[in-house]
């Protein structure tokens, strides 16, 4: 039964006939009903496994909701949604593009720095890239008539590869940079490996992370060289878009304060 439920879960996550979270809840619920989730308790005297009770099955099914790591991921995801809905993520991205976007290489570093700044607060590289970085990149490429099926080498390929590569680096630098990080940490702790906290994780990866972060846009520039070398128009566009945002709104200020407080408490 367990193998059937597990196989059904995998197929459901691949085909996605409904949201993945809902598929996971169905799998856990079915496991609870058939009492195949928790490991049976073996009687030391007889060596015979005891029957799993309803209480044990329910306790196993709900155990994840009391897991501190799960709540950490949930809180960070909420902060990530706040960045997108408040517009703070877009403001940060436009500011950096306006300052560094006068050349194609500088624009690549602007995208990389934006992702690095957002990484501690948005534990999903997909949400970070799709919710904040990609909308900016997709607005820049048409300015140079660069599309996936038309002139991609002008600048579009370079910018998208930088966004893809740097988000992998930033996801590794911070414990809250990607959802799998704290989960992997918990699995390590259960295996007897001393678990790191936010600060020790950051310091441990920092020497390698700095090198990777610095060379990634540069290597992408070398191996996926854009035909457009200078891009003052992009910096001007970003500056105009940034001005249209006006002063920081109440929601953006509140979001920034929450982010700083959360980061301080995580450290």
Each model region followed by its residue ranges:
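Flexible hinge motifs at transmembrane-helix junctions and intramembrane kinks/re-entrant loops
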Residues: 8-26, 36, 61, 213, ...
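Interfacial loop-to-helix junctions that mark the boundaries of transmembrane helices
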Residues: 1, 12-19, 55-68, 194-207, ...
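Membrane-embedded alpha-helical segments and adjacent helix-loop junctions characteristic
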Residues: 22-148
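Transmembrane helix-loop junctions at the membrane interface of multipass transporters and ion channels
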Residues: 50, 54-55, 59-63, 183-200, ...
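Hydrophobic alpha-helical transmembrane segments
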Residues: 2-3, 7, 22-25, 70, ...
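Transmembrane alpha-helix interface/packing and boundary motifs in multi-pass membrane proteins
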Residues: 10-18, 114-124, 164-175, 265-267
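Juxtamembrane and boundary regions of transmembrane helices in multi-pass small-molecule transporters
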Residues: 125-129, 144-257
């Amino acid at each position: 039964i367990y193998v059937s439920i597990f196989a059904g879960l995998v197929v459901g996550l691949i085909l996605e006939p409904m949201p993945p979270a809902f598929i996971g809840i169905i799998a856990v619920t079915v496991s609870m009903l058939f009492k195949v989730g928790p490991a049976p308790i073996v009687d030391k005297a007889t060596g015979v496994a005891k029957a799993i009770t309803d209480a044990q099955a329910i306790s196993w099914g709900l155990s994840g909701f009391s897991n501190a790591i799960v709540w950490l991921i949930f809180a960070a995801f909420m902060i990530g949604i706040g960045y997108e809905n408040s517009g703070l993520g877009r403001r940060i991205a436009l500011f950096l593009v306006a300052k560094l976007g006068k050349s194609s290489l500088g624009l690549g570093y602007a995208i990389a720095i934006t992702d690095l700044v957002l990484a501690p607060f948005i534990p999903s590289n997909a949400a970070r890239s799709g919710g904040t970085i990609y909308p900016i990149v997709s607005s820049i490429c048409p300015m140079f008539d660069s599309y996936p099926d038309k002139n991609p080498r002008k600048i579009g390929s370079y910018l998208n590869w930088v966004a893809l590569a740097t988000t992998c680096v930033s996801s590794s630098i911070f414990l809250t940079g990607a959802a799998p990080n704290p989960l992997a940490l918990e699995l390590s702790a259960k295996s007897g490996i001393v678990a790191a906290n936010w600060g020790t994780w950051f310091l441990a990866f920092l020497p390698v992370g700095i090198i990777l972060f610095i060379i990634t846009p540069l290597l992408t520039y070398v191996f996926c060289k854009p035909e457009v070398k200078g891009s003052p128009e992009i910096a001007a566009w970003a500056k105009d878009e940034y001005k249209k945002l006006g002063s920081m709104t109440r929601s953006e200020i509140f979001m920034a304060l929450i982010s700083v407080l959360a980061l301080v408490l995580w450290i």
